[in-house]
């Protein structure tokens, strides 16, 4: 069974991938040196690589040019990376020494050298984007259905919740941001041979350190004085650079973005309402408060996660995951994410269970949404499902701790959306690995049972 459809948009111009890998006659085939009952081997045979090739082909253009990497290689690398929580560097090292990784990615003979450059992973992430990479989630659900780990009924009753996907940034403080803005401006001016009257690097570093020390000692008046000293020096550097590059359009264009960020950092205050700059390299980062005692505020973007409200045999799969920017109210995200889920799976959602943060939601079918603590219209079966609402919390914890959603290193808002989709797909495929291993163990136990004892049973 294949769920959903999905459209693809053209990305960078690249020739259609061509998988013309052949077996090396001087080396043994991978199938001859690995255990064909290994869960990775069984999972590779269950995945419909042709479907992924069809979806990923949307970013390719027919015509001359070097063909892109094989789709199975690209998709397999992304799956392995997020299944086992690996960085790009560690993934490449593991791939070279692990024959199961190579078989999973479609190699026929053992490779002693990488058939791709490590930077290709970054290029393909940017080229595919969320719209194509969500096909990995779709394929994971299709494999789960084929192996009886998930049923169509599990898609009709769902739990929706949101979490924060933190960005890889340092904890933002006014002093740190002002100091970093000054350093970046001075470095950029030096690279473009723009002479400055004074760089203030040494005294700015000292002032930033003293702000932290005074704050730690509860000497807030001195801390404010040191922060004011730092802001004045940052303003001097900004004005000096503007004077020196006046009339030079090339330099003005090069300095424009950093100068705009530096001005915002200099003027913003910790009491200021609305969007602020929390990292110079990631200005899209938002401050989100979830009411946690250990982390009152988190810096990243909001992500909506949907899981079944039932108990699938293979575990609590992630049915849909999407990054949401602008720190929207949870209730206003319900209608679009449910529409995205139904488009992905092709199954109409009949019951939706949410927490109290979704009160005042915008879903059109009000009577299909059940809010935690609701009393009216609650029957015994629905009450049992409402008790399952909290099952989404450990799923979110596993995705963040074990599948690279806990700290997002990808750049920009596109990186937020890409990482959310890949983390959900990696979690689903890890559940499938465990499910296939359980099936294999059950088969072995059934074969090892004595026929006489089986008849007595």
Regions found by a protein language model. Give the residues of each.
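Flexible, glycine/threonine-enriched loop-and-boundary segments that flank and lead into catalytic domains
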Residues: 277-298
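Helix-centered, glycine/charged polyanion-binding patches within enzymatic domains
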Residues: 342, 346-418, 457
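Charged, often Cys/His-bearing segments associated with DNA-binding zinc-finger transcription factors
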Residues: 1-50, 54-57, 434-457
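Short, conserved catalytic/metal-binding motifs centered on acidic residues
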Residues: 38, 75-77, 88-92, 117-121, ...
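Flexible loop/turn segments at secondary-structure boundaries
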Residues: 286-289, 312-314, 327-329, 358-362, ...
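Electropositive, glycine- and tryptophan-enriched low-complexity nucleic-acid-binding patches
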Residues: 292-344
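Active-site- or DNA-interface-adjacent structural scaffold in DNA-acting proteins
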Residues: 108-284, 363
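Basic, low-complexity intrinsically disordered segments
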Residues: 11-15, 53-149
């Amino acid at each position: 069974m294949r769920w959903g459809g999905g459209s693809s948009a053209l990305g960078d111009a690249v020739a259609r991938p061509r998988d013309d890998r052949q077996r090396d006659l001087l080396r043994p085939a991978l199938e001859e040196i690995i255990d064909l009952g290994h869960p990775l081997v069984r999972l590779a045979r269950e995945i419909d690589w042709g479907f992924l090739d069809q979806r990923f082909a949307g970013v390719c253009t027919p015509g001359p040019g070097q063909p892109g990497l094989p789709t199975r290689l690209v998709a397999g690398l992304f799956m392995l990376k997020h299944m086992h929580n690996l960085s790009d560097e560690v993934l490449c090292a593991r791939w070279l020494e692990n024959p199961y990784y190579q078989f999973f990615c479609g190699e026929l003979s053992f490779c002693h050298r990488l058939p791709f450059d490590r930077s290709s992973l970054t290029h393909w992430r940017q080229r595919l984007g969320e719209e194509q990479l969500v096909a990995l989630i779709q394929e994971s659900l299709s494999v789960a259905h084929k192996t009886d780990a998930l049923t169509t009924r599990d898609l009709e009753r769902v739990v929706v919740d949101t979490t924060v996907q933190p960005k890889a940034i340092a904890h933002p403080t006014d002093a740190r941001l002002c100091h970093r803005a000054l350093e970046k401006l001075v470095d950029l001016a030096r690279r473009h041979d723009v002479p400055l009257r004074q760089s203030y690097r040494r005294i700015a570093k000292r002032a930033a350190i003293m702000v932290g020390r005074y704050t730690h000692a509860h000497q807030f008046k001195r801390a404010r004085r040191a922060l004011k000293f730092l802001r004045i020096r940052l303003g001097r550097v900004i004005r000096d650079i503007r004077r020196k590059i006046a009339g030079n359009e090339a330099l003005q264009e090069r300095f424009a973005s950093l100068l705009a960020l530096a001005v915002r950092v200099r003027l913003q205050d910790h009491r200021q309402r609305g969007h602020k700059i929390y990292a110079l390299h990631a200005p899209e980062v938002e401050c989100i408060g979830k009411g946690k005692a250990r982390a009152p505020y988190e810096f990243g973007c909001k992500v909506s996660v949907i899981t079944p409200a039932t108990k699938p045999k293979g575990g609590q799969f992630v049915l849909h995951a999407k990054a949401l920017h602008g720190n929207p109210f949870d209730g206003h995200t319900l209608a679009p994410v449910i529409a995205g889920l139904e488009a992905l799976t092709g199954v109409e959602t009949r019951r939706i269970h949410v927490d109290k943060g979704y009160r005042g939601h915008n879903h059109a079918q009000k009577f299909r949404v059940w809010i935690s603590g609701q009393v009216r219209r609650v029957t015994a079966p629905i009450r049992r499902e409402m008790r399952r609402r909290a099952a989404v919390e450990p799923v979110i914890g596993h995705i963040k701790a074990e599948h690279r959603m806990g700290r997002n290193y990808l750049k920009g808002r596109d990186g937020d959306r890409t990482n959310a989709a890949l983390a959900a797909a990696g979690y689903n495929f890890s559940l499938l690995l465990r499910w296939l291993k359980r099936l294999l163990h059950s088969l072995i136990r059934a074969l090892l049972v004595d026929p006489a004892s089986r008849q007595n049973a």
